[in-house]
């Protein structure tokens, strides 16, 4: 997304709040800890802590830049020590007494589900954390963790964060059904394809100005698939009377499931306004079907064999339909 100085960051946060925004997502390691520090300074200077929902994360190595690679085992991972020091430091940087949502940033496979959920629950009991989230973790791990938590009077995960967009739909295979089962909200990242979803007009403008794509992986060209999906997004955008491809990309994930809160970022207030525009756009079933036809997605076995949940599809699976006539209306 490019760099910003503190003044520019505060201006963007001010515009976000004035537009009605109140939830900010960050992590212990973002920008070598500066993200949490700046957010904390902004909230304090504006006296807005009570109005803001802060979501941050632990697991990532947030001290590598300071202590050096290979020397920061206690500052990363899902284990108790990592959790303890990370939350301690996040509270200090954010200049707050509590974290609204604390995420496990990613599953490291080195700490047991029981240890992680027990340790997280203690933070909730202490009032340091209000709700728990989990990010970039297999659905089976989250399911086992939530079953353990609810079976033992612990706090379960209430929101899942992961990669999902109209071009990359693996999220729909197991994550969405899992979240539906546990009543979890969804916070997808990479909704706009890491900045690669750009209309032909926007790309020509960039070329004219000597700019490439400014993405998380550097400046580069669109792939053939990204060009195709961008053209499709532009077509749907035109049907909604807008030129914003990103607004349609955001509207797509919001139209696919309940309780979807896309994570979006940007450096300019005009980008923020385009993102907000997506909140008023509701895609039709035909538009969703069209977008998904551009780059077909195979949900894989067993769903492509037994079908999805009839409560969602409103129709019986192939095997059930062979045996009985059932209405799901």
Curated annotation (Swiss-Prot):
The answer to whether UniProt assigns keyword NADP to this entry is yes
Q: Some GO term, biological process aspect, for this entry: which one?
A: aldehyde metabolic process
Q: Which InterPro entries match?
A: AKR_Detox_Biosynth, NADP_OxRdtase_dom, NADP_OxRdtase_dom_sf
Stimuli inducing this protein: By oxidative stress.
- Which residues bear the site annotation Lowers pKa of active site Tyr? 57
Question: Which Pfam family is one of this chain's hits?
Answer: Aldo_ket_red
Q: EC no.?
A: 1.1.1.-
Q: Where does NADP(+) bind?
A: 190-200
Enzyme class, broadest EC rank: oxidoreductase
Task: Name the catalytic site residues.
Answer: 30
* Superkingdom to which the source organism belongs: Eukaryota
Keywords in alphabetical order: NADP, Oxidoreductase, Stress response
What residues does substrate bind to?
Answer: 105
List, in alphabetical order, the Gene Ontology terms for molecular function in this entry. aryl-alcohol dehydrogenase (NADP+) activity
User: What protein family is recorded?
Assistant: Belongs to the aldo/keto reductase family. Aldo/keto reductase 2 subfamily.
Return the protein name: Probable aryl-alcohol dehydrogenase AAD4
């Amino acid at each position: 997304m490019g760099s910003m100085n503190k003044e520019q960051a505060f201006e963007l946060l001010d515009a976000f709040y004035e537009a009605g925004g109140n939830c900010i997502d960050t992590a212990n390691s973002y920008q070598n800890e500066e993200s949490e520090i700046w957010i904390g300074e902004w909230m304090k200077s504006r006296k807005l802590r009570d109005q803001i929902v802060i979501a941050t994360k632990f697991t990532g190595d947030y001290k590598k830049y300071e202590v050096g690679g290979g020397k920061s085992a206690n500052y990363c991972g899902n284990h108790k020590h990592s959790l303890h020091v990370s939350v301690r430091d996040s509270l200090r940087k954010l200049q707050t007494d509590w974290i609204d949502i604390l995420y496990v940033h990613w599953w490291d496979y080195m700490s047991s589900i029981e240890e992680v959920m027990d340790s997280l629950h203690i933070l909730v009991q202490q009032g340091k954390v209000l709700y728990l989230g989990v990010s970039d973790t297999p659905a089976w791990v989250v399911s086992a963790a939530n079953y353990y938590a609810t079976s033992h009077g612990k706090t379960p995960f209430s929101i899942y964060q992961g990669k999902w967009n109209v071009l990359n739909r693996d999220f729909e295979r197991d994550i969405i059904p899992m979240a539906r089962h546990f009543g979890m909200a969804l916070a997808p990242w990479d909704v706009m394809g890491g900045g690669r979803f750009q209309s032909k007009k926007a790309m020509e403008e960039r070329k004219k100005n000597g700019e490439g794509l400014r993405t998380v992986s550097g400046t580069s060209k669109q792939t053939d698939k990204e060009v195709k999906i961008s053209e499709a997004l532009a077509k749907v955008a035109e049907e909604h009377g807008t030129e914003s491809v990103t607004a349609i990309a955001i509207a797509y994930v919001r139209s696919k499931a309940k309780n979807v809160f896309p994570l979006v970022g940007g450096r300019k207030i005009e980008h923020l306004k385009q993102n907000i525009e997506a909140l008023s756009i509701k895609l039709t079933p035909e538009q969703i079907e069209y977008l998904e036809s551009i780059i077909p997605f195979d949900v894989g076995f067993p769903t492509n064999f037994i079908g999805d949940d009839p409560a969602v599809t409103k129709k019986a699976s192939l095997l059930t339909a062979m045996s009985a006539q059932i209405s799901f209306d």
